[in-house]
UniProtKB/Swiss-Prot annotation:
Pfam families: Actin
Protein purpose: Actins are highly conserved proteins that are involved in various types of cell motility and are ubiquitously expressed in all eukaryotic cells.
Broadest EC class assigned to this enzyme: hydrolase
Official protein name in the record: Actin
PANTHER family: ACTIN
Locations listed in the record: Cytoplasm, Cytoskeleton
InterPro entries linked to this entry: Actin, Actin/actin-like_CS, Actin_CS, ATPase_NBD
Natural source organism: Hypocrea jecorina (Trichoderma reesei)
Gene3D superfamilies: 3.30.420.40, Actin, Chain A, domain 4
Gene: act
Amino acid sequence: MEEEVAALVIDNGSGMCKAGFAGDDAPRAVFPSIDGRSRHHGIMIGMGQKDSYVGDEAQSKRGILTLRYPIEHGVVTNWDDMEKIWHHTFYNELRVAPEEHPVLLTEAPINPKSNREKMTQIMFETFNAPAFYVSIQAVLSLYASGRTTGIVLDSGDGVTTVVPIYEGFALPHAIRRVDMAGRDLTDYLMKILAERGYTFSTTAEREIVRDIKEKLCYVAHDFEQEIQTAAQSSSLEKSYELPDAQVITIGDRFRAPQALFHASVLGLESAGIDVTTFNSIMKCDVDVRKELYGNIVMSGGTTMFPQGISDRMQKEITASAPSSAMKVKIIAPPERKYSVWIGGSILASLTTFQQMWISKQEYDESGPSIVHHKCF
């Protein structure tokens, strides 16, 4: 492979798509993983109206569209929409011809095997990529943090995973996955706001609630204490201006993120992120636990709450750890929203990685199932 052809790195999240060129230190394009279909008939001729819109354009026209996310809980549920998002990524965002560049995609662990086979098939058959690779998101986050040992808590919009990695090897028996992440918190916040008399019902209005969550919500260090403070004073209240200039005030801004630690409020049986991380460490060999406790790496957009999430995590895991002498360290890099992409950029530009790609020739010989042999 010639040196000058940069590989394309695409981190297809359930909520946001991050795309760019290997070797760059940040993605060139970051846009919502959304396909929007018109709810109304266009009657004005010559306006260039389209049947469907993707990404930011869908977001800006959301008032007249039905928005769909083709990736749910890290698994692609609508391949036609997914193809549109990839087409948009290559031709509109990055402005490249996919047949000229190797493509690295990312995936959540413990995904159905058919998901990565179909990804492989589309990249080679629809987009004619010369080479392809799919990598586990949490492993890339660890690359980005410059470590080879650590336990990665990766929480995005659709799925939260905990992956322990020792000396560069993922420990598959201890991987934990919870299908609760940012989108569930957004839905929970919609419910909380509905109790206050603010109803958001359409797919477009849900995006407003997501914005409220990202701008106003935070993780309480002590949930019970915070509830008392919120009940007794208005010091925690913040206001938000809706697109129609109506202003709403929210006091208990810590309630929605609390679901990360107590999934039962969402009606889910799964444990919170703290307990899931602890359980994963306890599933690992006793000799490696100490290093995992000292290298808990956070990544993904749902770990980006402006205050409190790493302190709370530190407090909960220290309380669970078998001895008080155990040093618990939470690493929350400021760029963790994009650390999966950054890790992919590092990996795809390593000279030692170049023999790892699945080539078009190998695909033609073996078919989509080759992805299970070549990508771990």
